[in-house]
């Protein structure tokens, strides 16, 4: 009986760690073009999370992998250790490749949701959320974005149930 309980607990942890869903009442962008999304993005705002705690000047670089997936290189400055921290991961489409819903992993078989829910026509600004409303990033091709545009993206997030008070701004 004890072995069965441990197995069930580990299975639940595994499934919880592999959540790639989109938060309720939110849809990823359609007519998504990965080739236009590839390249460097800068984190302008985020809901803080355990894997980015204490980091600033965060950037993400996306490139194609040989297996058709996306190589993800995240980099951020730790003021505590006074050095750059880098994480390398991989991402794959959850649905069709023209929908902005991907799953991303930085650790073995564990995937999380990477859902692009707002993206400008020129692929310069992006609003990305995870599997629930505890994960949110506003990304820009440059380290800053016009304040009125940032406000538009933050209002969009707020109108979809994200707590604006939890969002850190880095510009």
Give residue spans per PLM region.
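Bacterial N-terminal signal peptides that target proteins for export
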Residues: 1-7
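A beta-rich soluble binding module of mature secreted/lumenal proteins
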Residues: 18-171
């Amino acid at each position: 009986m004890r072995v069965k309980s441990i197995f069930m607990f580990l299975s639940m942890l595994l499934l919880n760690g592999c959540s790639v869903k989109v938060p309720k009442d939110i849809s990823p962008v359609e007519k998504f073009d990965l080739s236009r999304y590839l390249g460097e993005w800068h984190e302008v705002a985020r809901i803080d999370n355990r894997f980015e705690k204490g980091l600033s000047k965060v950037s993400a670089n996306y490139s194609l992998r040989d297996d058709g997936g996306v190589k993800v290189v995240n980099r951020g400055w730790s003021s505590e250790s006074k050095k750059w921290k880098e994480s390398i991961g991989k991402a794959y489409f959850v649905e069709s490749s023209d929908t902005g819903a991907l799953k991303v992993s930085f650790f073995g078989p564990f995937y999380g949701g990477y859902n692009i829910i707002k993206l400008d026509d020129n692929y310069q600004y992006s609003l990305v959320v995870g599997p629930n409303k505890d994960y949110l990033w506003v990304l820009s091709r440059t380290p800053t974005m016009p304040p009125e545009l940032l406000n538009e993206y933050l209002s969009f997030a707020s109108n979809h149930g994200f707590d604006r008070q939890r969002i850190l701004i880095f510009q």
